Swiss-Prot record:
Motif residue range(s): Nuclear localization signal, and RNA-binding (RxRE): 2-19
Region named Disordered: 1-26, 89-169
UniProt biased composition (Polar residues): 15-26, 127-150
Record-level Gene Ontology MF annotations: RNA binding
Biased composition annotated in UniProt, kind: Pro residues: 96-117
Family: Belongs to the deltaretrovirus Rex protein family.
Segments carrying motif Nuclear export signal: 83-94
Entry's free-text remark on domains: The RNA-binding motif binds to the RxRE, a complex secondary structure consisting of four stem loops and a long stretch of stem structure, present in incompletely spliced viral pre-mRNAs. This region also contains the NLS which mediates nuclear localization. These overlapping functions prevent Rex bound to RxRE from undesirable return to the nucleus. When Rex binds the RxRE, the NLS becomes masked while the NES remains accessible.
Compositional bias (Basic residues): 1-14
Highest taxon, organism lineage: Viruses
Designated name of the protein: Protein Rex
Length: 182
């Protein structure tokens, strides 16, 4: 009976034996965290060595720290705390918002600006009022007048839902769908 060999579990070559400290801090290379900073990365070198009975607790020669931000405030400007307190006092929820300031009076050298009004398109069948100002009589000539006929009176056979009621702006294709052709 031939002897069978035991399959040994091979460890990959790139796997190292475990150490009590992280591998990235053992090397003498600069250890960077990947963030952009103005100072160089700190080099970690472990102090202490393993001996037969156990391991000496480790210490580090350099510890990273964040430098204090320089005071860039110019003399005479209030600090952020004073500004935030002032802002909080002016924008308290109890007080109503201040009314908007009125526009300055127009100077006598500039011509008065006319206020813009939206044009009112009236149906051609409705008669314009006699006291209409001349600025609104121009708007009475609606763009639908030249291309469409006035709204036809609904006949008995037409459906009131499909025909456009008089008084609204008629659309050319949908003035009356169900009315018979002439």
């Amino acid at each position: 009976m031939p002897k069978t060999r035991k399959q040994r579990s091979r460890r990959p070559k790139n796997q190292r034996p475990s150490t009590p400290w992280p591998i990235s801090q053992v090397s003498d290379r600069a250890f960077s965290t990947g963030t952009l900073s103005t100072f160089s990365a700190t080099v970690y070198r472990p102090i202490g060595a393993p001996f037969l009975g156990g391991f000496v607790p480790l210490g580090y020669t350099a510890m990273p720290y964040w430098p204090r931000a320089p005071n860039i405030r110019l003399p005479g400007t209030p600090s952020m705390d004073a500004l935030s307190a002032q802002l909080y006092n002016t924008l308290s929820l109890d007080s109503p918002p201040s009314p908007p300031r009125e526009l300055p009076a127009p100077s006598r050298f500039s011509p008065p600006q006319p206020l813009l009004r939206p044009p009112r398109f009236l149906h051609p069948s409705s008669t314009p009022l006699k006291n209409t100002p001349p600025s609104e009589t121009i708007a009475l000539n609606s763009p639908w007048e030249s291309s469409c006929q006035p709204c036809p009176s609904p006949t008995l056979g037409s459906d009131p839902k499909t025909s456009t009621p008089c008084g609204e702006a008629p659309l050319c294709a949908f003035t009356s769908i169900s009315s018979p052709p002439p």
